[in-house]
Amino acid sequence: MIRTLIVDDDPFVRMSLQTILEAQDDVEVCALGADGDEAVELFERERPDVLLMDIQMPGSDGLGAAERILGAHKHARIVFLTTFSDDEYIVRALRLGAKGYLIKQEVATIAPALRTVMAGQSVLGGEVLD
């Protein structure tokens, strides 16, 4: 099972992602969070295989949380799922050590992306590669 932590400020997105991922035989959502501070706290407590997280959230954002998590756990697998395909965000996320960067509109790619990251590879959503 791929234990996955989902962090997004939108409760509808969190619940939708949970529903989509838990329909997979090999994915378990271990916790849900709403901001970067919760991402750090839940990562420490749950030790997920993959953290699926939005970049822009009120308060503590995803990039700041990723920096804190990767500072303490350099092998953490973080995949950003966002509406932003901005070069600045992509470059910053990858420099921090994120294993993936997906666009929210590409929902069908999420579960395969988690499997790819678990296999030791990195993933980038289609829009990001344009």
Residues of each region from the PLM?
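Short hydrophobic/Thr-rich beta-strand motif most characteristic of the beta2 strand and flanking loop
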Residues: D26-A34, L42
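Conserved acidic segment of CheY-like receiver
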Residues: M1-V13, L17-L21
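Acidic catalytic/metal-coordinating carboxylates
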Residues: D35-E38, D61-G64
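Receiver (REC) domain active-site loop signature in two-component systems and cognate sites
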Residues: M57
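Active-site residues of response regulator receiver
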Residues: D8, D54, T82
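Active-site beta3 strand of CheY-like receiver
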Residues: E46-L52
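Short, flexible helix-to-coil linker/hinge segments that flank and couple to helix-turn-helix
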Residues: E88-R95, Q105-D130
